[in-house]
């Protein structure tokens, strides 16, 4: 990446692609050329990696059962494109419910979030995907794809740093318009997207509007903001794509509304201030509860920084990632707002987030009496 900072104006896109891949390798991804993968161009999974991971982490499954599970994931696209994306994402995070030959249903994990080294991390370039256009076979070839256990979790589109006419907007159009139109079967497995021209590097989802793709300006909380050309790329790779960090973001910081609202096609990934805020708030709350200090802490967020989503990410952390802390257990979370605008904003988000929060019912209380009734009627859970 250092040599990119001194490029002489004659860089081509392929050289930037090679440098980007090399940097991903430096943080733990293993390179594999797309043309070296034994597959049909209509297939978008790396079968060998998928089956190897299942054999390692679910050794009780027979080879033919692993094959059956692979086919379940491979043939996932029966609903709308967005509903399929949402369904597959839930499989990746929660596992797939599968019934082996013994007849006892089990959840089979597709990714090991607790032990990252059990996963197979691949960075793949020039991965050709075939589609039919007016009866003719044609192909698309995304610049870079990140595979975990044979599944393409993130698509990265790069533009030439030396070409003033090649912009990250073009990269965004390539993903959100052309790829969805021509090769949706690939994007069914790709919740995340990254666009970069070297100077600007932005993170979003495959459904994110262009204006909501954002830079990731810190690797760790407290770091100096990265603002120089090519620093954005380095910070993005180290701050988002280091494998352990990538799994953390992928598991808890990608937001989908409840399945019944899939028609809205809403998918959001956190911005870096939301990620670090939710992390620090969780740590502070856990410390306060365990030590019984009553000092949870205060978080200041500027107008428009996405505080409501920060609270959603925090609530998910408290609900799902504190199971080993008996003092927290299955918490009941109360969110108090001081403006009608925030009340409406909160209702709009949280009422459609039962699956994301995993806390059960989401209620809106009108006054203290109503709140006492709500709290008195439950021993745990609820928002």
Protein language model regions, located:
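Conserved motor-coupling elements within RecA-like helicase/translocase cores
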Residues: 367-383
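Extended, non-catalytic scaffold segments that flank or surround catalytic motifs
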Residues: 360-366
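ATP-dependent helicase/translocase motor core
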Residues: 2-333, 337, 341-360, 378-383
